[in-house]
Design a protein with these regions (language model features):
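Positively charged n-region of N-terminal signal peptides that target proteins for export
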Residues: 1-4
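Bacterial N-terminal signal peptides
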Residues: 9-16
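Hydrophobic alpha-helical segments with strong N-terminal bias
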Residues: 6-7, 118
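Extracytoplasmic metal-acquisition and chelation regions
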Residues: 17-157
């Protein structure tokens, strides 16, 4: 008797768990994926895109973005994305080659921003690629993302 109750309880738990997973994945299957080059940019995009898109980052928290080497699974994930969004200003040195192998739309957020040049150290005279750190420029990132995504998907404006 005890074995029967244990078996039925286990069966009930397994069936409840598998049913809830299926509902979650079905809800997201119809949403397009936006792939960001790094986590901070993905966070900004999530705040712009709200629930209209699934937003993912190629790199994970704590990973060095500047010299990142995309993996084969990154290419597979990117090939099914609606759009790839990167920062620009040389922040992701790997992005140009990465995107050249894909047939995916690309938005480079800092592309139309005037650079702020680094004034000292080894990088003196080069554009500072961390433009989102400035609150003013962070707001420009949001404006650029709203305009770019609205242009690509006017129905999601």
């Amino acid at each position: 008797m005890r074995k029967n109750i244990l078996f039925l309880s286990l069966l009930l738990l397994l069936s409840l768990g598998s049913g809830s997973c299926k509902r979650i994945s079905n809800k997201n299957e119809s949403k397009e994926v936006i792939l960001a080059s790094f986590t901070v940019l993905a966070d900004i995009i999530r705040n712009v895109a709200k629930d209209d898109f699934i937003v993912r980052s190629i790199t994970k928290p704590g990973v060095e973005v500047h010299g990142y080497q995309p993996t084969p699974s990154d290419l597979v994930n990117a090939s099914s994305a609606f759009v790839f969004i990167d920062n620009g200003f040389g922040f992701e040195l790997w992005a140009e080659k990465f995107v050249s192998n894909l047939k995916v739309k690309r938005i480079t957020v800092a592309e139309d921003l005037d650079p702020i040049f680094i004034s000292e150290d080894f990088y003196k005279g080069k554009p500072n690629p961390h433009a989102w750190i400035s609150p003013k420029r962070g707001m420009l990132y949001v404006d650029i993302l709203v305009d770019s995504l609205s242009e690509l998907r006017p129905s999601k404006r």
